[in-house]
């Protein structure tokens, strides 16, 4: 066993710089490839297929999307490919400035028919939704968005794509990997560990890996939270209607999550908090800005716009 481990250690020591560069490039490439080649991957994942056929984008949804693009002032040369998605919220990927463009999935529920029809079967986490139950009625109401709320939801995705935030979000992994490697190598040189036993260096490397992962988790979550807050503020700053739509959008998300919490029973309690936020997968991480925080932030913007002092 010592032979293969020793040869592996020697190989890593000899080619550590090349391995580091390759690993960093690989981490960046894997994350960015989803946005460099969004079509048809994203559409395959989120396309709405009623009765076994892909649903074409309706004139109503296309008009809504064009209205949002006009409000934001998207340059005519930027490429967007909207499609009808089965999700409750819009989805997007890509870089509209590049030839491959960006894709935006517009929820079919924006048409209203899927929500108002109580005979339509919807299965969430393996359970059929009873639209006539109190929780089902609340969920149906939460999925019905006003025109302003729909525009905010779509505009948020367009602002995200136009800003290039996707590229920024791919940086923590390679940066933390390179930083962990550089600091650990420098520390081992300073402590003289390269002249000591391999077991001691292995233990030090293990500690460095743990510290590096903690740094990655903290930096990635902090960046995500900051960008989501900026994204909401930037979208809401388009007009008072977008602020109002944003408040409604997050109110409806919280209401829908509370309805799902009731519909799914114990599983729902594991997925959603009593306030309607999503329960983090890991206790030590905050993967996203809480919906209550996002709603309250926009609510403050709305109150500032309608206050007498504003005029």
Swiss-Prot record:
InterPro entries for the chain: TMEM177 (IPR026620)
Any one GO cellular component localisation term in the record: mitochondrial inner membrane
Paired cysteines (S-S): none
Keyword Membrane: yes
Transmembrane regions: 18-38, 165-185, 198-218
Topology versus the membrane: Multi-pass membrane protein
Position of the signal peptide: none
UniProt keyword terms in alphabetical order: Membrane, Mitochondrion, Mitochondrion inner membrane, Transmembrane, Transmembrane helix
Mitochondrial intermembrane side: 39-164, 219-311
Chief site of localization: mitochondrion
Positions on the Mitochondrial matrix side per record topology: 1-17, 186-197
Location of the protein in the cell: Mitochondrion inner membrane
Top-level taxonomic group: Eukaryota
Sequence similarity: Belongs to the TMEM177 family.
Subunit-level organization: Found in a complex with COX20, COA6, MT-CO2/COX2, COX18, SCO1 and SCO2. Interacts with COX20. Interacts with COX1, MT-CO2/COX2, SCO1 and SCO2 in a COX20-dependent manner.
Annotated PANTHER family: TRANSMEMBRANE PROTEIN 177
Protein purpose: Plays a role in the early steps of cytochrome c oxidase subunit II (MT-CO2/COX2) maturation and is required for the stabilization of COX20 and the newly synthesized MT-CO2/COX2 protein.
Name of the protein in question: Transmembrane protein 177
Species the sequence originates in: Rattus norvegicus (Rat)
């Amino acid at each position: 066993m010592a032979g293969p481990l020793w040869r592996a250690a020697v190989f890593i020591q000899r080619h550590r710089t090349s391995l580091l560069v390759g690993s960093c490039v690989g981490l960046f490439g894997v994350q960015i490839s989803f946005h460099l080649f969004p079509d048809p991957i994203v559409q395959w994942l989120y396309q709405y297929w009623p009765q076994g056929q892909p649903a074409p984008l309706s004139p109503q949804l296309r008009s809504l999307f064009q209205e949002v693009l006009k409000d934001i002032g998207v340059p005519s040369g930027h490429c967007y490919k909207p499609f009808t998605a089965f999700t409750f919220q819009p989805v997007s990927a890509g870089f509209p400035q590049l030839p491959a463009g960006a894709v935006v999935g517009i929820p079919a529920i924006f048409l209203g028919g899927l929500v108002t029809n109580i005979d339509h079967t919807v299965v969430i986490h393996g359970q059929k939704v009873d639209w006539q139950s109190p929780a089902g009625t609340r969920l149906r109401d939460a999925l019905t968005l006003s025109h302003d709320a729909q525009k905010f939801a779509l505009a948020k995705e367009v602002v995200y794509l136009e800003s290039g935030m996707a590229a920024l979000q791919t940086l923590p992994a390679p940066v933390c990997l390179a930083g962990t490697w550089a600091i650990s190598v420098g520390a081992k040189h300073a402590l003289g560990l390269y002249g000591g036993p391999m077991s001691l260096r292995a233990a030090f490397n293990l500690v460095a890996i743990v510290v590096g992962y903690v740094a990655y988790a903290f930096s990635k979550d902090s960046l995500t939270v900051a960008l989501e807050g900026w994204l909401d503020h930037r979208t809401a700053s388009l007009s008072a209607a977008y602020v109002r739509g944003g408040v409604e959008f997050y109110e409806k998300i919280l209401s829908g999550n509370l309805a799902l919490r009731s519909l799914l029973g114990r599983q729902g309690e594991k997925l959603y908090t009593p306030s309607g936020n999503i329960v983090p997968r890991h206790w030590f991480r905050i993967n996203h800005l809480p919906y209550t925080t996002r709603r309250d932030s926009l609510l403050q913007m709305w109150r500032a716009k309608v206050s007498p002092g504003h005029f």
